[in-house]
A protein has these predicted regions:
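Extended non-catalytic accessory segments flanking core domains
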Residues: 2-198
Length: 198
């Protein structure tokens, strides 16, 4: 465990998360060992979880660039830190199935209690057909009501598919063809997957 506050590494040698994320799909720091500092916004290290936690830059420390994410996933079995803590983390940057994360963690230092970053407000549909890269790993708040349209994986994976409006199979209301295909694409960009992290 950690003492109440361990500040030896805090505030030193850190790279802003947004620089690691960058505006593109692949981090320029991939394969390099870096140190970052931020707030644990979700801890998913419990049994059956994602084997890590989400770390986001504190409000007031962001680059204010709407094209870059301010958060990373930290893949680790280390138990240091908990939800809401500000931590200093050192590890290797890796792109894992399109997700920028830190792995091979060499240290996690608790720097005290942090304040959770404010969630970013988003609306559906996704403008480019899928959740934007600049929201990767970040806290979000979806405007408006959402409808559960699929709960097949709820018991096994804790997943729900949510949509901005109720949805039906396109061919239930349209003849197979371009019209049904267009509606299917429209429905796809009006969905998101909610996972409980377990």
């Amino acid at each position: 465990g950690l003492p109440a506050v361990a500040v030896g590494d805090c505030g030193t040698g850190v790279i802003p998360v947004s620089r690691i994320q960058c505006p593109g799909d692949h981090s320029p720091f991939a394969g390099q060992t870096v140190s970052v500092e931020g707030i644990i916004t979700m801890d998913a290290r419990q049994q059956g979880g994602f084997r890590g936690f989400y770390l986001q830059q504190a409000d007031g420390e962001t680059d204010n660039d709407p094209k870059t994410s301010e958060a990373l996933f930290v893949y680790t079995h280390r138990t240091d830190g908990q939800h809401g803590d500000r931590v200093h983390v050192s590890g290797r940057v890796k792109e894992f199935h399109g997700l920028t994360e830190l792995t091979d963690i060499t240290s996690i230092t608790r720097c005290g209690n942090g304040r959770l970053p404010e969630p970013v407000s988003v609306t559906l549909p996704w403008q480019d057909g899928e959740p934007p890269e600049h929201l990767e790993n970040m806290r979000i708040n979806v405007a408006g009501e959402l409808t559960v349209i699929n709960h097949y994986n709820l018991a096994r994976y804790g997943e729900l598919t949510l949509a901005a409006k109720p949805q039906t199979m396109a061919t239930e209301i349209l003849e197979p063809g371009p019209g049904a295909q267009s509606r299917h694409r429209w429905q796809a960009i009006n969905r998101l997957l909610l996972d409980d992290g377990l």
